[in-house]
Each structure stands twice: as C-alpha cells, then as structure tokens.
Amino acid sequence: MTEQLQPLRGMKDLLPDDYKVHDYIINKARDVGVLYGYKQMSTPIVEYTKVFNRSMGESSDVISKEIYSFLDKSNDCVALRPEFTACIIRSIISNRLQHKLPLKFFSTGPVFRYDRPQAGRQRQFHQLNYEYIGAKGAITDADTLKLAVDILKALEIEQDTTLELNSLGCNESRRVYQQKLVEYLNDFKEQLSEESKIRLSKNPMRILDSKSETDQKIIANAPVLSEYYTDESKEYFEELIQYLDILGVKYSINPRLVRGLDYYCHTAFEFTTKKLGSQSTILAGGRYDGLAKIMGNNDDVPAIGFAAGIERIALMREYDVSEVKPVFVLPIGKNNICYALEIVDKLRTENIAIIIESLGKIAKRMQRIFNENAQFIIFIGDEEQANNNLKIKDLKKEEEYIVDFAKALELLKK
C-alpha cells in the first residue's frame, strides 16, 4: 500500500477558509501601516545562519534549540528565518540604504521555529512585522506603540489585550543592573535550572525570561532594572509615558519585562491576552539601537519594531470575512459550450467572477453550484444560443430572467 503523505509536524496547510482570514488580517494591518507611512518589503525566507547567530545570540533558545539550520549543496550553513528583524537590517546594509534613513518597513510571511506544536504555536507560522529604522527618541517609540494599538483596534481585538511596558534603560543602566543581578543570582546558583546556570555566565538577563517555576521563585525577589536607571534613562521613559498619555494609549508597567540581548535599549513592550492560555503574547517589540553595528554596519542605527502572530490573532475572534461570490455559467449541452465560453470571457473582462460548470450531469452540476451558495446561475441552451440571450436565475430572490448580454451585465453588477 502506498504511504499516505502528510505535512510535517507543526506545519499546517492554509486551506481557502483559513487563507481568507489570514488575508483579511494582513490587509487590515497593511492599511493601518500605510496611514503611518510604512512601505511593504520582503526578504528571502532562507538566509545565512550567521545572520541570526549575530542578531539573536548563540546562547538564545531560538539559536540553540529552535532554528531550522542546515548545510545546502554548496556547503553553506543556511537557515529558514525564525524572525524578520535581522533580515530587514541585513537588507538595509547589503542594499546600502543607510543614506535613505529613516525608513519604515512592513513585512509579512512565514517564519520557522522547531518548537513543541500546540494551539497558537506551530513550527511554521506567519507574522506581521513593522520596523522603523533610523529614528530615535521617545516620540518615535510612542508613534510605534500607537501604530500597534491601531492595528489591534482595526482587527477588533485591542479590548482583549493589555499593553505591558518597560524601559531597559541605556547601556550604563543595564551594565550596572546586570552586575547587581549576577550578585543576587550567585547566592542561588545551585537552585537554578540547568539552563539558567549556563545563562548566568553568558547572558544573565535571559534568566528573567525563564519558564522554570524554581527560577521564577528566585527571580521574584531579584533586583529590578528601574532601580538602576541613569538620569537619561529616567527622562526617556518619563517622556514616553507623557506621549502615550496624550495619545490615550493604556498601558501597564511591567518591571520584569526585559530583553536579554545587548543591542536592545529603552522601550520594550508586549500586548498580552488571557484568551489564549499559555500563548498569551499577541504582539511584541522594542527598541534595538545596537543591532545594525553587530550585523556589520559601521555605526549604530537607532531602530524600533514589533511583530505580531497572525495565527494567534485569528484565534482571538471569529472573523466573518465576506468574499466575492462567482456567477456560475451552465451550458446545457455539449453544443452550447463554445457559446458559453464566449459569454464567460466577455463577463470576466467586465470584472465579474465567473465559473463555468460543464462537466457531468445537470443535477450534479446544480448540486455543486448550490454547495457554493451562489446567487446567480446563467443557463445557456439551444434557445438562448439561437437568440443571443441568457437565462439568469437569481437563487436568492427565486426569480428568472431571459435577457440580452447588456441587460445581463446590468443585472449581475447590481
């Protein structure tokens, strides 16, 4: 018996009904982005693995456990993209776009992470991604956060989310804080999870993201980053809060919300929900002024961005997405097919969606049409063909018309 082929675990087909919802979400988000001056771009799905090694760090979960990385036939180490930000920065550098900064880019498409599949968390999933490159200051961060809010509003889920906000401060703030954090965690070194023991020497701030219950109990009494803000960091965060209040953006300050990579600074944020269980983050982002230099640019480039999971958004509510219902053309006999094809072609040039049903018995063809919830059927038999007429049945109104092409066009375009 021939093996029945299946998709890879954690990778799902997007069937028409799913794709319809995805398309709706993307279009809504794109339209909001346009109002903020964002332009769409795309990058390859496959990049050199070093693009992500540099951006995410070799000790990160994504690089150490989740990335789809392999040698291609040229013996180059390449990877399926696990996120967009590194790809966008790489593109700006390789296309020498630095002189055009600031730039606002919107991207969307699949990303890949080898993780345990569950609802709202697949190995191939789709993201909306926004990057504001080359602009610094709290006003830029406020504008970016308002964009995120407006996207969630357009998708009718903003009311079910909470904006969790924190400041990572400047480099000096984080340097001092990291020292204090290590001093505190060293007292609990033997109690930390094995993963956190490794992170303690490599990237201690990542321990704050640990999912281990034991680690969480230890972290609960750890020093808080805000205690070590410089005057500059305090002023930056206070300015951001002022702008958000003016814009009417509601937020909850979460002092434990951090990013474990050195190139992140100042603003970090997540929009979370209680509707999706453990997969509570819908949209997340932050400021990453140091990434471009790490990736080979001569200088730091100020930047802020965020990504949102399309599958998770789709789980938040049911979207009743309307779609164009095609008109069905049904030639009665084989000798009516040529005339039917002419009619179909003429109607399509008038931007009317048409499907010709010419295969099988009339009853079966009619059943297929009923299954599509069509409104109009055009019957073409010998009489219609001889008189250059069309018989149109309106299934909703339960009315029937025999009209010429011009009248048919008028009826179908109503």
Swiss-Prot record:
This protein's species is: Rickettsia rickettsii (strain Iowa)
Cite a single Pfam family from the UniProt record: HGTP_anticodon
Output this protein's name. Histidine--tRNA ligase
Q: Which InterPro entries match?
A: aa-tRNA-synth_II, aa-tRNA-synth_II/BPL/LPL, Anticodon-bd, Anticodon-bd_dom_sf, His-tRNA-ligase, HisRS-like_core, HisRS/HisZ, HisRS_anticodon
Q: Does this UniProt record's set of keywords contain rRNA-binding? A: no
Q: Name one GO cellular component term.
A: cytoplasm
The places in or outside the cell where this protein is found are: Cytoplasm
Q: How does it associate, per the subunit comment? A: Homodimer.
Q: Family assignment?
A: Belongs to the class-II aminoacyl-tRNA synthetase family.
